[in-house]
């Protein structure tokens, strides 16, 4: 088991409970899709896992260790084992592709090396190899500001893999992409989950994508899990009755 959430709850200052007693596990190589409308709690849950938001109740257990109270070096070590893929890419637009990929190892190298761009030959070789893996080697020295959304997200995937993560957290990774680019990005994520045995937690609005690429789906409604099962068991009745009704939106629920 890579990750376990036990009774995670979070209440925002407005008084709305964004998460209510969330519990689940995810295994190595498993792709778990989190679905639900905006405000359902998807992004809050991902932020609690990465300690960008502190839950009010419950435990997050990663590789058998409770991470709720980790601080300083231990918290950085924990985060270095988790790759992040963002809806808005979170790239440095003025830098080229390989420089952005190299940023993926900043959490595991001395801060002075990162600040000065002092990467080892091994790190550089790994960055180029990852760009090749996602079909972006020919754009290695191109500024990211000149690339398409799909190309930027592929660089985002390579950057996340730079730290050799045990877990990928993907916050709406295809929300800004066209259908073809979306399929390309999800194919790469699935490929790495299978070939590198990386657990992947992906929040999605696109139901068909969740059914096609996920091994398992969890649906949230108003901060509660209303479905947890395999894609084939998620029928229209469950969708309309349990998932896409009575969702309240709160300013606390944001993308990562």
UniProtKB/Swiss-Prot annotation:
Principal location: membrane
EC number of this enzyme: 7.3.2.2
Bilayer topology: Peripheral membrane protein
Amino-acid positions noted as binding ATP in the UniProt annotation, renumbered to this chain: 36-43
InterPro entries attached to this UniProt entry: AAA+_ATPase (IPR003593), ABC_transporter-like_ATP-bd (IPR003439), ABC_transporter-like_CS (IPR017871), ABC_transpr_PhnC (IPR012693), MetN_ABC_transporter-like (IPR050086), P-loop_NTPase (IPR027417)
GO MF term set: ABC-type phosphonate transporter activity; ATP binding; ATP hydrolysis activity
Database matches in Pfam families: ABC_tran
Keyword field contains Transport: yes
GO CC terms of this entry: plasma membrane
Record's subcellular location: Cell inner membrane
Domain ABC transporter: 3-247
Keywords associated with the record: ATP-binding, Cell inner membrane, Cell membrane, Membrane, Nucleotide-binding, Phosphonate transport, Translocase, Transport
Keyword hit for Membrane: yes
Catalytic activity: phosphonate(out) + ATP + H2O = phosphonate(in) + ADP + phosphate + H(+)
Protein purpose: Part of the ABC transporter complex PhnCDE involved in phosphonates import. Responsible for energy coupling to the transport system.
Alphabetized PANTHER family for the sequence: AMINO ACID IMPORT ATP-BINDING PROTEIN, PHOSPHONATES IMPORT ATP-BINDING PROTEIN PHNC
UniProt record similarity statement: Belongs to the ABC transporter superfamily. Phosphonates importer (TC 3.A.1.9.1) family.
Subunit architecture: The complex is composed of two ATP-binding proteins (PhnC), two transmembrane proteins (PhnE) and a solute-binding protein (PhnD).
Protein's name in the database: Phosphonates import ATP-binding protein PhnC
């Amino acid at each position: 088991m890579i990750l376990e959430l036990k009774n995670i709850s979070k209440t925002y200052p407005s008084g709305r409970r964004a998460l209510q007693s969330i519990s689940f596990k995810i295994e190595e190589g498993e792709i778990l899709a989190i679905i639900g409308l905006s405000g359902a709690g998807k992004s809050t849950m991902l932020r609690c896992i990465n300690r960008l938001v502190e839950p009010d109740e419950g435990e997050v257990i990663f590789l058998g260790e409770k991470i709720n109270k980790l601080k300083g070096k231990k918290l950085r070590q924990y985060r270095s084992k988790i790759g992040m893929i963002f809806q808005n890419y979170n790239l440095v637009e003025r830098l080229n592709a390989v420089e952005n990929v190299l940023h993926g190892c900043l959490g595991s190298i001395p801060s002075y090396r990162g600040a000065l761009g002092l990467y080892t030959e091994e790190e550089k070789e790994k960055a180029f190899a990852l760009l090749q893996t996602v079909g972006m080697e020919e754009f290695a020295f191109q500024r990211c500001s000149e690339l398409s959304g799909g190309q930027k997200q592929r660089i985002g995937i390579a950057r996340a893999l730079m730290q050799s993560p045990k877990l990928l957290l993907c916050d709406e990774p295809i929300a800004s992409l066209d259908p073809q680019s979306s399929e390309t990005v999800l194919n790469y994520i699935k490929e790495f989950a299978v070939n590198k045995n990386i657990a992947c937690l992906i929040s999605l609005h696109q139901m068909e994508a969740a059914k096609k690429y996920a091994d398992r789906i969890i649906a949230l409604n108003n901060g509660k899990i209303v479905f947890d099962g395999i894609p084939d068991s998620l029928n229209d009745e469950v969708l309309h009755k349990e998932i896409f009704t009575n969702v309240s939106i709160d300013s606390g629920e944001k993308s990562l």
